Amino acid sequence: MNDENYSTTIYNRVQTERVYEDSDPAENGGPLYDEVHEDVRREDNLYVNELENQEYDSVAVYPVGRQGRTSASLQPETGEYVLPDEPYSKAQDPHPGEPTADEDISLEELLSPTKDHQSDSEEPQASDPEEPQASDPEEPQGPDPEEPQENGNEMEADLPSPSSFTIQNSRAFSTREISPTSYSADDVSEGNESASASPEINLFVKAGIDGESIGNCPFSQRLFMILWLKGVVFNVTTVDLKRKPADLHNLAPGTHPPFLTFNGDVKTDVNKIEEFLEETLTPEKYPRLAAKHRESNTAGIDIFVKFSAYIKNTKQQSNAALERGLTKALKKLDDYLNTPLPEEIDADTRGDDEKGSRRKFLDGDELTLADCNLLPKLHVVKIVAKKYRNYDFPAEMTGLWRYLKNAYARDEFTNTCAADSEIELAYADVAKRLSRS
């Protein structure tokens, strides 16, 4: 068996294996799943721009710069890279042939912190098919965000148990009177690069319940992680959706966070922002983040829609089947993470089916754009499913837990996560109580 055929065989194990395909229609939740799935495909309903009829709170600005990284992580890699935009384009349908349904249950209603969500018809800004839409939240009635807990950096090297991960709310973004705090761009920028040589980047993200800290928004975290990994100096502004400063409204009228300005130009589409940053912030100065393997961009693509049907369900008799659907989606991701990439295969491992992958992330040992897209959603699923369904990711999914362990050990991920309490509160009205009716 030659090298090419062997590598192809390895990938076919993940791409063509049907063991974990949904054979039970009940796992799709019937009409509920169809309605959720229809909303996932209809990206025009996601992140509808409603700023004209909403108010923002005041904003908090934080300068962010390059964090300490190894020289290896800054070196551009060779080979072909695949941007994830194509797999997540509007033409992408992770489950072709699914019946469509009425739009009574929209994804923004499903995943919004409030029940009375406004639905405007202005141009959408985000085209990720699996993210919840930000909405105009009511005044929250819940606990304050959790205090910082044990950081993932302190985890032991052995395989963690499902309950061993707790995420701390980043101290780096605590605020005092809505002013820059904790560090400045000069403190964290590397080298002696002049300010004039670097682009001026301002990222606007959703604020938490206190109006200042980072809120629950996988879109925002996705862009936050990308900029951090690029090592570019940028400012982060948290925006509370209850009020709006006039200057922010004038900057991006009719636009929800996240969005950014790049040397004064406003950019609002998340996928296009990702593509722009990858094409603009290039080696040798900035690392390349696109995944080398196309399969990495689609790994875990159906997890969030399975989770949405599972958490929205109110019928006790449907719960087990929907839970199996989520578990199968997680298992497919686990299989991909345990399957060696072509570069992990050498003469010593060929023919050894027990020799699995040891890589840290989806596409290798460094975070890529694929991870920036998947990890924020995977974190939400983990927190919310445990809180409202007492569901833990199965301990036997060693690839999945290795992936999470390595992600929680990276500041680029943990310090851009919202507090667990923020995520739980956002889903308080979404997660429905099960009944026997």
Swiss-Prot record:
Cysteines paired by S-S bonds: none
Tissues where the protein occurs: Expressed in most tissues. Higher levels found in kidney, heart, skeletal muscle, T84 and PANC-1 cells.
Reaction(s) catalysed (UniProt annotation): Na(+)(in) = Na(+)(out); K(+)(in) = K(+)(out); chloride(in) = chloride(out)
InterPro entries, per the entry: CLIC (IPR002946), CLIC5_C_GST (IPR042069), CLIC_N (IPR053823), Glutathione-S-Trfase_C-like (IPR010987), Glutathione-S-Trfase_C_sf (IPR036282), Glutathione_S-Trfase (IPR040079), Thioredoxin-like_sf (IPR036249)
Gene Ontology terms, MF aspect: chloride channel activity; oxidoreductase activity
Enzyme class: oxidoreductase
PTM comment text: Phosphorylated.
Keyword Ion transport: yes
Polar residues bias: start-end ranges: 1-14, 161-184
Annotated EC: 1.8.-.-
Keywords: Cell membrane, Cell projection, Chloride, Chloride channel, Cytoplasm, Cytoskeleton, Golgi apparatus, Hearing, Ion channel, Ion transport, Membrane, Mitochondrion, Oxidoreductase, Phosphoprotein, Repeat, Sensory transduction, Transmembrane, Transmembrane helix, Transport, Vision, Voltage-gated channel
Locations listed in the record: Golgi apparatus; Cytoplasm, Cytoskeleton, Microtubule organizing center, Centrosome; Cytoplasm, Cytoskeleton; Cytoplasm, Cell cortex
GST C-terminal domain span: 263-427
Region (4 X 8 AA tandem repeats of [AGQ]-[SP]-D-[PS]-E-E-P-Q): 118-149
Biased composition annotated in UniProt, kind: Basic and acidic residues: 34-45
Example of a GO biological process term: visual perception
Region (Disordered) residue spans: 1-197
Renumbered ranges of Sequence repeats: 118-125, 126-133, 134-141, 142-149
Annotated membrane topology: Single-pass membrane protein
GO CC field: apical plasma membrane; cell cortex; centrosome; chloride channel complex; cytoplasmic vesicle; Golgi apparatus; intracellular membrane-bounded organelle; mitochondrion
Biased composition (Acidic residues): 121-157
General function of this protein: In the soluble state, catalyzes glutaredoxin-like thiol disulfide exchange reactions with reduced glutathione as electron donor. Can insert into membranes and form non-selective ion channels almost equally permeable to Na(+), K(+) and Cl(-). Required for normal hearing. It is necessary for the formation of stereocilia in the inner ear and normal development of the organ of Corti. May play a role in the regulation of transepithelial ion absorption and secretion. Is required for the development and/or maintenance of the proper glomerular endothelial cell and podocyte architecture.
Family: Belongs to the chloride channel CLIC family.
Quaternary data: Component of a multimeric complex consisting of several cytoskeletal proteins, including actin, ezrin, alpha-actinin, gelsolin, and IQGAP1. Interacts with AKAP9. Interacts with TPRN. TPRN, CLIC5 and PTPQR form concentric rings at the base of stereocilia and may form a complex. Interacts with EZR, MYO6 and RDX; the proteins may work together as a complex to stabilize linkages between the plasma membrane and subjacent actin cytoskeleton at the stereocilium base.
Domain notes: The active G-site contains a monothiol Cys-X-X-Ser motif which mediates glutathione-dependent redox catalysis.
Protein name: Chloride intracellular channel protein 5
Record lineage: Eukaryota, Metazoa, Chordata, Craniata, Vertebrata
